[in-house]
Regions:
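Conserved donor-binding/catalytic core segment of Leloir-type glycosyltransferases
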Residues: 4-6, 146, 173-201, 212
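N-terminal strand-loop element at the rim of the active site
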Residues: 5-15, 19-64, 76, 152, ...
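Nucleotide-sugar-dependent
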Residues: 16, 191, 241-248, 253-274, ...
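Membrane-proximal helix-turn-helix segments that form the acceptor-binding/catalytic region
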Residues: 23, 67-77, 92, 104, ...
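Glycosyltransferase donor-sugar binding loop
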Residues: 210-223, 238
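Nucleotide-activated donor-binding/catalytic signature segment of Leloir-type glycosyltransferases, i.e.
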Residues: 222-251
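Conserved acidic donor-binding segment of nucleotide-sugar-dependent glycosyltransferases
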Residues: 297-298, 302-310, 318-324
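A short, well-ordered alpha-helix in the C-terminal region of glycosyltransferases
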Residues: 318, 325-340
Length: 360
C-alpha cells in the first residue's frame, strides 16, 4: 500500500502523525510519503519516509499553502493508494480530486477551537465555525472519515471508524519521585499558561518543587513564559520531539493539565493525561468531562477546579508528600492505559482500516 500523508498545518513531527501512524505503516511494510511544512519548522522526515516540503498554513496566511498543497495533491495522489489528510486545510486542497482512497483523519474539533485563535477577529469566529461545519458535511459525503475520538461522532450524520489517540506503554518506567512536576504540550492561554506560571511561582516560593514545561509557547504568552523561566518559576524546555519529551516525563511527581473550559476541549481526551499514566506518573487536571472520566476509571488522577491555583498547588504538594499514594496511582493508572488506551492495539486497527479502503 502506498500512502501519502498530508498536513500543511501541523508540525510534521506531530505525535499522532509521526510517532504513531507513520511508524505503524512502515512496520506493516507500506510505502509512506509525507507532505508537510518541513522547512518552515526546521524538521526532517524520519528514515523510510519520502518527504515533500510544502508551505505552512498558519494564522491568516493560508492561501499560498493551500495553492501549493492543491498542486502537490494533483501531482502525487494518482501514485498512491491512500491519501491521508490531517487538517481541514488539506481537505479543502483535496476537493475535486478524483481518488477513491482519500481519508480525513479527524483528530481535533476545529470549528469549536476557532474562537480561541488570537489571529481571528471575534466577529468572524461564528461565521468561520459555520464554514468549517459545512466543510465537515461536504467531507462526509465525499471522502472516508477516521475519527480520533468517539465523541466526535456527534458531529457527523453517519457512523465512522474510530482510532483513538492512544499511546505507547513502555515495558518499564521509573518510580514517580518527589520534587518535580511536568506539563507536556503547547503552551497557550487556553491551555493554562497563566496557571502553569502561577503554580510554578507558588511552588518555587514554597516546597521548591520544580515545574518542567515541555512545549512551544504561543505568541500571546511567549513573553510571560520567558519571564517565568528567567525568574526560576518554571523550567521551560520549548518544543522537543515527543519521544524526547516523554523521557522528561519519566520519574516526575505528577503531570499537569490545566486546560480552560473551552468548547474544543470538552469532547477531546487530553492525550497528555494518557501519556503521563503510561509513563507511571499520576496527573492533576482541570474538570473537562473526559479528564474527569479518566480520573475515575483509571484511579490515576486528581481533578481540580478551573482556574483554582490553590487547589492545583495543594494537589501537587499532597502528592509530593505521600510516596505510597503517588506510587499506587501511578501503578493502577498505567495498567488501565495498557488495557484500554494502548497504541499497540489501536495501531493495528488503523492499518487494517486503511488497507480495507485501499482495496476498495
Amino acid at each position: 500500500m502506498r500512502v501519502l500523508v498530508v498536513c500543511p498545518v501541523h508540525d510534521p513531527r506531530d505525535a499522532r502523525i509521526a510517532e504513531r501512524e507513520i511508524p505503524a505503516l512502515l512496520a506493516a511494510g507500506h510505502d509512506v510519503t509525507q507532505a508537510g511544512p518541513f522547512t518552515a519548522v526546521g524538521a526532517i522526515a524520519q528514515p523510510g519516509v519520502r518527504p515533500i516540503d510544502i508551505p505552512r498554513s498558519v494564522g491568516r496566511k493560508r492561501a499560498r499553502a493551500l495553492r501549493h498543497t492543491r498542486r502537490m495533491l494533483r501531482e502525487q495522489a494518482p501514485h498512491h493508494d491512500i491519501v491521508l489528510l490531517h487538517s481541514p486545510d488539506a481537505v479543502i486542497a483535496a476537493s475535486g480530486l478524483d481518488h477513491a482512497g482519500i481519508v480525513w483523519d479527524v483528530h481535533e474539533d476545529t470549528a469549536a477551537a476557532v474562537g480561541t485563535k488570537p489571529w481571528l477577529p471575534r466577529a468572524l469566529a461564528a461565521p468561520a465555525a459555520w464554514s468549517i461545519r459545512a466543510g465537515e458535511a461536504w467531507a462526509e459525503r465525499n471522502v472516508h472519515l477516521l475519527l480520533a475520538e468517539h465523541s466526535y461522532a456527534d458531529r457527523f450524520a453517519r457512523s465512522h471508524p474510530v482510532v483513538p489517540n492512544s499511546v505507547f506503554v513502555p515495558d518499564a518506567v521509573p518510580r514517580p519521585e518527589r520534587g518535580r512536576v511536568v506539563y507536556l504540550g503547547s503552551v497557550t492561554r487556553a491551555r493554562g499558561a497563566r496557571e502553569l506560571i502561577e503554580v510554578g511561582r507558588l511552588l518555587a516560593d514554597g516546597p521548591a518543587i520544580r515545574v518542567d514545561v515541555i512545549g512551544g509557547a504561543g505568541p500571546e504568552v511567549l513573553g510571560d513564559v520567558e519571564v517565568a523561566r528567567d525568574r526560576g518559576w518554571i523550567a521551560w524546555h520549548g518544543y522537543v520531539k515527543n519521544s524526547v519529551a516523554l523521557s522528561l516525563v519519566d520519574g516526575a511527581t505528577a503531570g499537569l493539565s490545566l486546560l480552560h473550559d473551552e468548547p474544543n476541549y470538552r469532547h477531546s481526551m487530553p492525550t497528555k493525561l494518557l501519556e503521563y499514566l503510561a509513563h507511571g506518573v499520576p496527573f492533576v487536571s482541570t474538570p473537562l468531562p473526559l479528564a474527569v472520566e479518566l480520573a475515575e476509571v483509571s484511579g490515576g488522577g486528581i481533578i481540580v477546579p478551573f482556574g483554582d491555583l490553590g487547589a492545583a498547588y495543594d494537589a501537587i504538594v499532597e502528592l509530593n508528600a505521600d510516596d505510597d499514594r503517588r506510587q499506587k496511582m501511578a501503578d493502577i493508572g498505567r495498567e488501565w492505559v495498557r488495557a484500554n488506551a494502548n497504541w499497540a492495539i489501536d495501531g493495528a486497527a488503523f492499518i487494517r482500516q486503511l488497507e480495507e479502503w485501499a482495496r476498495g
